[in-house]
Amino acid sequence: MKKEKLSGKFWLALVIFCLTGQVAWTVENMYFNVFIYKMFNASAADISAMVMASAVTAALTTIIMGAVSDKVGRRKAFMSVGYIIWGVSIIAFAYIHSIMLTIVMDCVMTYFGSTANDAAFNAWVTDNTEEQFRGKVEGVIAVLPLIAMLIVAGG
């Protein structure tokens, strides 16, 4: 039986999880390269190594943890725990004192972010959205990165 509309609970969960993920990715994408450069006088090679390591971590994590979350079937748990640890790992950057540790922590942060957001959240959206609503849901998801940039850059 097809639903007439998506519940308010679904929309609230969608916006909270998606916006949380987008704010965290925006922080990483806008500030971590500048952070490693300004805090440790990192070279272009150091910054490139961090970006490369983070990208590889994200790709592998999304594939592997996506399969794990499919097998386990508890996407909300992967999302909730992943987002919390992701946030804590971002806070940990305030206590880092070396280029190498920054690169390692960026990969750790990316692992939890990719698990929560890329693997579990995106699959959860597909699992909980009937085909007739996917355009509307994806439209909201597409707007949230822009809102996240305004939140991060604006204050």
Where do the protein language model's features map onto the residues?
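Hydrophobic core of transmembrane alpha-helices in multi-pass small-molecule transporters
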Residues: 19, 89-93, 99-117
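Helix-breaking motifs and short loop linkers at transmembrane-helix boundaries and internal kinks
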Residues: 41, 73, 95-97
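Glycine-rich segments within core transmembrane alpha-helices of 12-TM secondary carriers
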Residues: 59, 135-155
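Helix-to-loop junctions at the C-terminal end of transmembrane segments
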Residues: 61-74
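Structural signature of the two symmetry-related core transmembrane helices
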Residues: 77-92
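Intracellular juxtamembrane helix-capping segments at the cytosolic ends
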Residues: 115-129
